[in-house]
Amino acid sequence: MKNKKKMCFGVIIGTRAYFNSELAKDVRKQLLETLTKEGYDYVILSEDATPTGSSSIETREDGLKCAKLFRENRERIDGIIVSLPNFGFEIGIINAISVADLNVPVLVQACDDENDKVDLDSRRDAFCGKISVCNNLYQYGIPFTDTTLHTYSIYSDLLAADINKFAAICRVVNGLRHARIGAIGTRPAGFQTVRASEKLLQASGITVIPVDLSEILAAAHKIEDTDEVLQAKLKEIRQYAVVPEQYSDKLVLQAKFGVAGGKRVEANE
């Protein structure tokens, strides 16, 4: 993903019919407002899509509706945010994520109880619900990201901070998933710290394209000093580095190497 668009999250509001549905409506409203304020798009079920209302997911049937919506927006969704206004019901949530099979990062957020609001209309019990949801994700082999605190108010400043951090995680994960990395030359014998397994990288979707150093050097030496791309590279380097005049010839060599390497990248994208 090359910052191609405004980031978009699939949003799941988990609930359980035993709890007051108004809690879920409030969380939905505040979460979507925060996403919009922070500059993100979102995909979420309509408020009347499930029996519990407020886009909330409880049963497997609810989860399948959400999974269908997420699959239809596969190309848009960069990550999934699960919010628990109350204990929630793990079955609906895990089916939504597993059946959608988007293979994107997942953030799990839960709301905490207020000490003076633990009656039937106000109790949340999302602390335990989050443990259940995360345990299911673990069982299904679905990686997930936790919030700064296990639970907090949906009105907390931590919400925006956690969403922005999660967005960065999504950019890295999705950006590397199909990355192609050029490996120029062999590893120096004295630097075992930079050893890496191409097979392990490939298992994560990262492909390594090796090239002999002599090929890049040969291509660099063929570049004329008057080459327009070379002159642009020299200008670029001088904009961020101060190079003494006596080293100007070395700078030209460095720039040629950069141009040759850049052309190799373009040829193997």
Spans of model-derived segments:
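Metallocofactor- and cofactor-centric catalytic cores in central/energy metabolism, strongly enriched
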Residues: M1-N174, H178-N268
